[in-house]
């Protein structure tokens, strides 16, 4: 299934049904009173979050959605049937924006949230409403209200507690596969991850959600590579795990490249708590590990954790540290 996180769609509420002009007809009664029923209300357009969905692919090919119109009123004071509401399911993390993308209309952050974006048109009034002492046989009725219509922009930002960042092939997908049941595509070449992957990490009786996005390259915040498109998916996370390829010849340059892209993209990412991990330490000597850690500490002023996602060394420690950070922010 394609991962779709941006769509533009047209929505329209159902129009109200028209009121009816009718007069009571009964044997031996020549001039029955007005008995025109009201029109039914049009259906509303409602968005609802659904935890079973993780992409906006349902809106890629069908882009026009209209709720059902209300039925017209009938004689004998029979009101028209109201139109059915149109319920559109979206993944948790979906944001609804105005057509130009400048105004946030709603943000779905929990399962089964509902948002009535367009109310159906009101039904028109039948002629029975217009009977007066001086007008016993009114032929007046009103038409149903025409419902609103609009184009809107849907944007999906995945919800996770932890986000992985790093250059391509730093080992993020391997880390995800080791600590969760997620099965991302993994190989020893850059850009194995082409779409975001989510996994749930279980620690004793607790759990948190972790997100792996395509690796960043220099210029990602300007649209280079794959990372820029998916950086928004880690904006909501509480902590970043920054993986650095320990086999790289210049781990400091690798770290700085990713940090620059994060800081250039948004202040949200710039100010995230960061856990720095030197990965692939299984292919390094103890002296090489310490040398690279010292270099990273010098530029980051932070603790750097040596790990190997291949041999699982140090991984559990990082998982528990991430959980501790998450709990401290609750």
From Swiss-Prot:
Residues binding Mg(2+), per UniProt: 173, 193
A GO cellular component annotation in the UniProt record: cytoplasm
Cofactor: Mg(2+)
Family annotation (Gene3D superfamilies): GTP1/OBG domain, P-loop containing nucleotide triphosphate hydrolases
Superkingdom to which the source organism belongs: Bacteria
Keyword terms of this UniProt record: Cytoplasm, GTP-binding, Hydrolase, Magnesium, Metal-binding, Nucleotide-binding
SS bond list: none
GO BP term, pick one: ribosome biogenesis
One family name in Pfam for this protein: MMR_HSR1
This enzyme's EC code(s): 3.6.5.-
One GO MF term attached to the UniProt entry: GTP binding
CDD domains assigned to the protein according to its UniProt record, in alphabetical order: Obg (cd01898)
Function: An essential GTPase which binds GTP, GDP and possibly (p)ppGpp with moderate affinity, with high nucleotide exchange rates and a fairly low GTP hydrolysis rate. Plays a role in control of the cell cycle, stress response, ribosome biogenesis and in those bacteria that undergo differentiation, in morphogenesis control.
Protein name: GTPase Obg
